[in-house]
Regions:
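Catalytic pocket-lining loop regions of alpha/beta-barrel enzymes
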Residues: 1-129, 189, 194-207, 213-216
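Short, glycine/acidic-enriched loop or turn micro-motifs at the edges of active sites
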Residues: 17-18, 134-136
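Mid-to-C-terminal alpha-helical segments outside catalytic/metal-binding sites
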Residues: 114, 118, 122-129, 136-236
């Protein structure tokens, strides 16, 4: 962990099938529908209780599905923060919401209507990155969920630019180098090779960056990643 902190690693956290499930409980409910949220919430809370975010402040963490139940439980967990410490501890109470602001959350998994709005009560748009859960989520569902995120009425264009493009470049600066994007605060500065005004107006560029970012994070084979990078370079 110390080494990952020293290089400012980007770590994406995602649940898998739980190692144990009570027999006969939730038998007819798909595991991703509910258990993934339980595990994500529990994992983040355990990391808070072990001071992971303060001990390793340079690691960039990404938690999935708009933080699962974190935004629902944040007030409650903050209220219990004193009880998480040993009675003899000289350390300050846990800062649950502060730790939420230290990480990134992807917007995958039907988050647009309610969940992301709740999360934005604890963090801001610079903590949100686009996510689709591809390739495990079928393409039609990915497209529908992306459209829902594009049409959110409680996020302005600056917020959406952060979610779809700028935060990805901040997390993976190599993307900015490949695509000729530089981030200055909450604005995008295009190079001399910039896209036409029409392309910028209809946000095709933003959508393309989102797809590339998601593809890079879901491809494990290095050879395939190289092929993706070649295609990205060709876009210039």
């Amino acid at each position: 962990m110390s080494y990952l902190d020293s290089i400012g690693a980007v770590i994406a956290v995602h649940p898998v099938k739980p190692s144990a499930l009570p027999k006969g409980v939730n038998r007819e409910i798909p595991i991703p529908a509910m258990e993934f949220f339980m595990d994500t919430t529990r994992t983040f809370t355990n990391m808070v209780m072990n001071d992971i975010f303060s001990r390793f402040p340079n690691i960039k963490w990404i938690f999935p599905h708009a933080g699962a139940f974190l935004s629902i439980l944040s007030d409650r967990m903050s209220g219990f923060s004193m009880q998480f410490r040993d009675s003899l501890s000289t350390k300050a109470p846990f800062d649950f919401k502060g730790d939420m602001r230290h990480v990134y959350f992807d917007a995958a998994g039907f988050a647009a209507e309610k969940q992301l709005k709740n999360l934005l009560g604890d963090v801001n748009s610079e903590n949100i990155v686009y996510g689709s859960d591809a390739p495990y989520t079928p393409d039609p569902a990915c497209i529908a969920q992306t459209g829902a995120l594009e049409n959110i009425d409680y996020m302005d264009e600056t917020d959406k630019e952060n979610m779809f493009t700028l935060n990805a470049v901040r997390l993976v600066p190599r993307l900015g180098e490949i695509l000729n994007i530089k981030t200055l605060g909450s604005t995008v500065c295009y190079s001399e090779n910039e896209l036409s005004a029409k392309d910028k107006a209809n946000r095709n560029f933003r959508k393309m960056v989102s797809k590339v970012y998601n593809a890079v994070f879901t491809v494990k084979n290095k050879k395939d990643r190289k092929e993706i990078e070649k295609k990205v370079y060709a876009l210039k």
